[in-house]
C-alpha cells in the first residue's frame, strides 16, 4: 500500500528545464521551486538568472552537471535536443520532450506541464488568460504590415509556425508564412537577398 500511495502522490520535485518555455511556464504556475537546473538561455523571469543553476545551452548540455543535480525529470524540446535526451535516458533519467510548433501546441504544452506537476487548475487559468488576450488582439483593427521574423541569424532562419500565427493574429502578414509550416529549421534557411526581395515593413 505504501508503494501504491507513493506512486499516486508522485510529482517531480527536481526538474531540469533545457528550454526557456518550460522554465517560464513553471514560474507562471508558481511551481518554480521544483526547478533545480535551467538552460543558459533562460532569462524570464529575470530572477531565474540568480536562482537557478545553468546546465548548458540549447543544443548542448553539461550531462555530468545535470546528473549531479539528481533530477527526477528533465524537460526538453524536439529533435534538436534528441541526442541530449537519449544520453540522459541511458543514464536512467526520466525525460519529457515537448514539440510545440503552433499556438495551439504551446497551450497544450502549458496544460501538460500543469498535469506533470499537479497544477492543472492553475494551468487551465493561464491558458484561459492567454486565449482571452489573443482573441482581444485578433479583434483589433490595425494596419496590415509585412513582417519578417528572424528566428536565427547565422544562418538566417525564418520564424516557426507559432511566430507566424502570432503575427497574423496581431493583424500582420508573415512574408515567409509558407516556410513557417516546415518543422525542420534547415528547410527555413534563407539567403539575405530573399529577405531584401520580400521587402518587409517590420523585422
What are the roles of these predicted feature ranges?
Residues 1-203:
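N-terminal ligand-binding lobe of clamshell/alpha-beta domains
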